UniProtKB/Swiss-Prot annotation:
The keyword Membrane does not apply. Its EC number is 4.3.2.1. GO terms for cellular component: cytosol. GO terms for molecular function: argininosuccinate lyase activity. This is Argininosuccinate lyase. PANTHER family: ARGININOSUCCINATE LYASE. Pfam families: ASL_C2 (PF14698), Lyase_1 (PF00206). The gene is argH. It catalyses: 2-(N(omega)-L-arginino)succinate = fumarate + L-arginine.
Length: 464
């Protein structure tokens, strides 16, 4: 006869119930219930394996699976009663299963601990989340390629130190973000590979005495392999840390892109227009059209960076194997995944709708002596050392600042006062088109190279 005074699955050795506040403080069901699909998936695979090795009968297996599928339906219908006193998603589902099918429900946990159960659930969940995020990256990249192709010959100023540097095409600029997102995609694919190793079968920490078939369970759940050490399987969360690191890099890229969009929509730049559906107004200033989506993405990057630091701090002092600290792994991981996915979705919707203001971009590229490097290169081709050419053009730029003339606005006579190597053909070099077309190599800003890069990008997306 049971003498459990706690009503908990682990209450046999306890003589009094858990304090009500402590029960609430230690419960995780309010946030880990989002793992229910993966918890049920893992339990169905575990029950199937237990029947295969003879620990459960086929009838017991079928009863458990039918019960779990019914519970999944209750959860998705919103009729499931989540109980804080049952601590977590695992015990809530197991208790409901026992309510429905009786003592057979108590056999499900044979050869399993919540330690390897939750580690498995999180990996299954993260695997699915990464797949969703990869889809949003691809969708955003497709939008960038479409915009880049349309704007392959749209000229704008390129910047260093936020100062006018050299002319570039808007398409080339957009493709820089495509390249960064490609690396983000690769990092997440690599992260998924390491997350897709099954800890189930590690039990509490040392494995189990039952004749389990871990490879069979892994096959049922779509894992690439089983973990090779039970202590490692239940205790580490490096796969979650790795995801948050990859997510942080991706959010850093989106944050930088957001900063550019905020600048470009400002009255001081006016390079692009964002459709109204991605903006909001002011409660006091009637004229305002605020780029809230990029501003929020820029701000939300801090949440993901915080999740990374939180998980690193969470893990750094833990001895092997499982510790209750690890309950704190889920909220930062969930938030990081949600934030990255939503930010990518917002960008994937917004980028194709950007409307560049071609005339303003071009006018900005005509200011700031953006073709100064082209003049230096022109003189190099005339046989002068580059450092001498750099100094010559620097004097010409100073003259331009003093007279209010860009290099292309100076007469041949004015230019020749700095070098007698300058001839009439220099003016073709000093045009914006001459500047961008001259950079006609792989990775360059020339329109022909932008179009070629778009083709390569589309091929990459098609291969995924």
């Amino acid at each position: 006869m049971s003498t459990d005074k706690t009503n908990q699955s682990w209450g046999g050795r306890f003589s009094e119930p858990v304090d009500a506040f402590v029960a609430r403080f230690t419960a995780s069901v309010t946030f880990d219930q989002r793992l229910y699909r993966h918890d049920i998936m893992g339990s169905i695979a575990h029950a199937t394996m237990l029947a295969k090795v003879g620990v459960l009968t086929d009838a017991e297996r079928d009863s458990i699976i039918d019960g779990l599928n019914t519970i999944r339906g209750e959860i998705e219908a919103g009729t499931f009663d989540w109980r804080v006193d049952l601590e977590d998603v695992h015990m809530n589902i197991e208790a409901r299963l026992t309510d429905r099918i009786g003592v057979t429900g108590k056999k499900l946990h044979t050869g399993r601990s919540r330690n390897d159960q939750v580690a498995t659930d999180i990996r299954l969940w993260l695997r699915d989340e990464i797949d969703l995020i990869l889809g949003e990256i691809t969708r955003l990249q497709k939008g960038l390629l479409e915009q880049a192709e349309r704007e392959s010959d749209t000229i704008m100023p390129g910047f260093t130190h936020l100062q006018t540097a050299q002319p570039v095409t808007f398409g080339h600029h957009l493709l820089a973000w495509f390249e960064m997102l490609s690396r983000d995609y690769e990092r997440l694919v690599d992260c998924r590979k390491r997350a897709n190793r099954m800890p189930l079968g590690s039990a509490a920490l040392a494995g189990t005495t039952y004749p389990i078939d871990r490879e069979y369970t892994a096959q049922l759940l779509g894992f690439d392999a089983v973990g090779g050490n039970s202590l490692d399987g239940v205790s580490d969360r490096d796969f979650a840390i790795e995801f948050c690191a990859a997510a942080s890099i991706a959010m850093m890229h989106l944050s930088r892109f957001s900063e550019e969009l905020v600048l470009w929509t400002s009255a001081q730049f006016q390079f692009i227009d964002l459709p109204d559906r991605f903006c909001t107004g002011s409660s006091i200033m009637p004229q305002k059209k605020n780029p809230d989506v990029p501003e929020l993405v820029r701000g939300k990057s801090g949440r993901v960076f915080g999740a990374l630091m939180g998980l690193l701090t969470l893990m750094k002092g833990q001895p092997l194997a499982y510790n209750k600290d690890n309950q704190e792994d889920k909220e930062p991981l969930f938030d990081a995944a949600d934030t990255l996915r939503d930010s990518l979705r917002a960008f994937a919707d917004m980028i194709p709708a950007i409307k560049p203001k071609h005339a303003i971009m071009r006018e900005a590229a005509l200011r700031g002596f953006s073709t100064a490097t082209d003049l230096a290169d022109y003189l190099v081709r005339r046989g002068l050392p580059f450092r001498d050419c750099h100094e010559i053009v620097g004097h010409a730029v100073k003259y331009g600042v003093d007279t209010g003339k860009d290099l292309a606005e100076m007469s041949l006579e004015e230019l020749r006062q700095f070098s007698d190597q300058i001839e009439q053909d220099v003016f073709a070099v000093l045009t914006l088109e001459g500047s961008v077309n001259a950079r006609n190599h792989v990775g360059g800003t020339a329109p022909a190279q932008v179009k070629a890069a778009v083709v390569r990008g589309l091929t990459l997306l098609a291969s995924r």
